[in-house]
Amino acid sequence: HPEKIESLKDSFKKNKSPEIENIESEKKIFVANSFEVHTKKIIALKDKTAFVIYPKDQKNFNKEKLKIYTQNGFVIENFQQKKLDLPKYFTLQRNGGIKTIISIEENKIALISGSENNCFFASLILLKNGNELMRTKCLPEDLKNNDFNGLGSSNIHLDDFLYLTLGTPEKHISKNSPLAQNNKYLFGKVLKIKKSDVIKKIDNQTETLKIDIFSKGHRVPQGLTRINDSIFNVEHGPKGGDELNLVIENGNYGWPLVSYGTNYLKENGGDGKSINFNHDLNNFNEPLLALVPSIGISSLN
């Protein structure tokens, strides 16, 4: 009974406090083609992190000021753990959990995965009281084929708007894939939300949060950043075809109809079939860069 096993693992992980260790390692230097990166280990954390926040007004780095959110629903500050106030439907099943943290004024909002009455979905939760600000429709795929690693997990602010990525949570092409082209669903999109509307929803739970689709046809858009007034994202392809995109309003990036990757082979749950790869000929936005084979692309800074 794989779903029972998933449920047991979910219950155990949600109640397991993160293990954190204050350490200080020697500095290491990693050399690339045109730059080098100096690193040293300052914290050892065995649990998956969802987001790290550091106050921008700090002149000298102090790791005790780090606020670390873990995927299983804890926040760590000054090396002290605290369990977050999350709804009962919050789930870690199928690689779920907290996927990103959004800051609007003094409010912290979590994008989380949820499970209720055989329905997997995503929602936005106000962390100070656990109130739900938004909930997606149910994912149509069989429970065992969902994979919340594909939910996406990135947000940026530009002018008066919040931009948030939601992917199609799946291991391989499935019933979830076409949602990226379906405007009735939020999955497979870059979403645009007016920040003042979020504040209205926080102040009045009866308000409906207005969410616009900025772009669509995204598979797993895990990285989002802005350079001046331009928005860029990186996303996972299937087997090959990771992408760097310039994201424009009303752009359609083609998933699952086009990709420079292919379906996974049968031993990985796919059928091994190729996918149309020419975006432009099929009236979709071409990526700035497509990577074959995949590099497991994630964040973009």
Where are these regions (language model features)?
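Beta-propeller domain segments
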Residues: 2-26, 30-32, 57-69, 96-98, ...
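Acidic, Gly/Ser/Thr-rich repeat motifs that build Ca2+-stabilized beta-propeller blades
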Residues: 2-170, 223-237, 293-301
